[in-house]
Amino acid sequence: MAAQEKIPMLIEGQQMLMDELARLHAERPKIIDAIEEARAHGDLSENAEYHAAKERQGQVEAMIGDIEGKLSRALVIDPKTLSGDKVIFGATVHLLDEDDKPVKYQIVGQTEANAKGGRISYNSPLGRALIGRKVDDEIEVSVPSGDRYYLISKIEFI
């Protein structure tokens, strides 16, 4: 059996997953209580509260399994320990768009991505176009709204 692929993530991404895992673990006893309470109402075949609680239990267990799997395969990266002149995972990249408007993105894992928050996945079209590039490189990115062009003006590891 092949080793499972590592999932790169920042320290903040790991903490976000650990916080969500703790929240889900805390929800487990509440769901069990809801199942027991609904079970006490009698006939389970037409007991909507029972079925809703069992469905929620299944959802929570699936989410716990998913998060535990991600954490077990996590390759946690601290961008402050990185350096270099190329865009890599964890880098913060300053760009100029076609209108010379400055934009800044940090290259992160899929679970951490939030484009409006300045964090893009290394697997996103822009993330893939940036990886391995240097300052003053021009890149073209095909997105659903059309092609976009950027100039890399600065690379930081913060």
Curated annotation (Swiss-Prot):
Single Gene Ontology BP term? regulation of DNA-templated transcription elongation
One MF annotation (Gene Ontology) recorded for this entry: RNA polymerase binding
Q: Does the keyword ATP-binding apply?
A: no
Keywords tagged on the record: DNA-binding, Transcription, Transcription regulation
Q: Where does the chain cross the membrane?
A: none
Give the InterPro entries listed for this entry.
GreA/GreB_C_sf, TF_GreA/GreB_CS, Tscrpt_elong_fac_GreA, Tscrpt_elong_fac_GreA/B, Tscrpt_elong_fac_GreA/B_C, Tscrpt_elong_fac_GreA/B_fam, Tscrpt_elong_fac_GreA/B_N, Tscrpt_elong_fac_GreA/B_N_sf
At the top level, the lineage of the source is: Bacteria
The protein's role, per its UniProt record: Necessary for efficient RNA polymerase transcription elongation past template-encoded arresting sites. The arresting sites in DNA have the property of trapping a certain fraction of elongating RNA polymerases that pass through, resulting in locked ternary complexes. Cleavage of the nascent transcript by cleavage factors such as GreA or GreB allows the resumption of elongation from the new 3'terminus. GreA releases sequences of 2 to 3 nucleotides.
PANTHER family attached here? Answer: TRANSCRIPTION ELONGATION FACTOR GREA
Q: Hey, which family's this protein in?
A: Belongs to the GreA/GreB family.
What is this protein identified as? Transcription elongation factor GreA
User: Which species?
Assistant: Zymomonas mobilis subsp. mobilis (strain ATCC 31821 / ZM4 / CP4)
Q: Which gene holds the coding sequence for this protein?
A: greA
